[in-house]
């Protein structure tokens, strides 16, 4: 099950923890993986770790021109694109009354608009071959909201609404569009928390632990697979029960 041999995948934000975990999991399932991100050294290190069946495609998704070249570059490198994982994201947290226009715009641009552009670019090839998987990495806060993250929550909620709309347009052509919404995931940020802060977080999570990149990646492998062909327009929450939605 969940065999991705012969499939090609593009993962954005692959120079970060969750993106790298997703790339590893897709690669382990047999896919050829294009690794995209802003930190070329991290992408090269990941490609070296995976040791074959990878392509490095650095891209700054805040730049429209770079974003619009990414899918064609991935298709050229791999001979097509079967799986798109829009994982890249940034934060510019601030209380709403103090949130600057430029910080709102930056988060919406990278987290939502780039996902729109990449999804749109990938559709033609996917629809032609009558197979495609578009997976958006959203967040639990896109459903619940979170004080101080109005811009981030809006972008992630926008991804969910966009994906539902797109899923209805392309389902008959063998293309599925789904979201994965992580909760609290282990990261350099969570490692810097005090014990008291970690305990407060864990009290919110019935599973009693933080999630890992591998937890998120496993959901992506499922949604990318042939076994998930009848699943579209959905949001798969990976949060240890923190929000039962």
Feature names for model-found ranges:
Residues 95-96, 100-108, 190, 201:
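Substrate-binding pocket helix/loop in short-chain dehydrogenase/reductase
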Residues 119, 155, 163:
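Active-site helix of classical SDR
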Residues 124, 168-172, 229:
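Alpha-helical segment proximal to the catalytic Tyr-Lys
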Residues 171, 176, 231-233, 239:
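Short, small/polar-rich loop/turn modules that mediate ligand/substrate recognition or access, typified
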Residues 29-46:
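Conserved glycine-rich Rossmann-like NAD(P)H-binding loop of the short-chain dehydrogenase/reductase
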Residues 8, 15-16:
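Conserved glycine-rich cofactor-binding loop
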Residues 139:
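Residue(s) in the substrate-gating loop at a strand-loop-helix junction
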